[in-house]
């Protein structure tokens, strides 16, 4: 089973923390990391926007990654959240075992 990292941005720290806690409680993620105070530049509705956001990294498995993404998308405050998932190419075996166990 592969380990995946999902990267997603939020407008508020409390939104990221609340959604992260739900993902862990539902066993869709083994753990989440929230990174505060990132600066994002993007085009939205014809304008260039520079905004303060926070980012969340979700640690999950190949068997839960699609469910986790759907849950994030359904519960995210943004109209179009930026959600990306990456398969980890090299993972410590003990960490992988822990992630798999936490998401069963």
Locate each region found by the language model.
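Positively charged, small/polar-rich N-terminal and surface patches that mediate targeting and assembly
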Residues: 1-104
């Amino acid at each position: 089973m592969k380990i995946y990292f999902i990267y997603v941005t939020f407008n508020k720290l409390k939104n990221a923390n609340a959604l992260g806690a739900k993902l862990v409680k539902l066993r869709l993620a083994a753990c989440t990391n929230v990174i505060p105070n990132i600066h994002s530049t993007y085009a939205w509705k014809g304008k260039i926007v520079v905004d303060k956001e926070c980012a969340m990294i979700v640690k999950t498995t190949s068997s839960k990654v699609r469910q986790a993404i759907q849950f994030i998308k359904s519960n995210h405050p943004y109209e179009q959240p930026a959600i990306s998932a990456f398969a980890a190419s090299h993972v410590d075996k003990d960490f992988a075992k822990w992630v798999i166990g936490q998401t069963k």
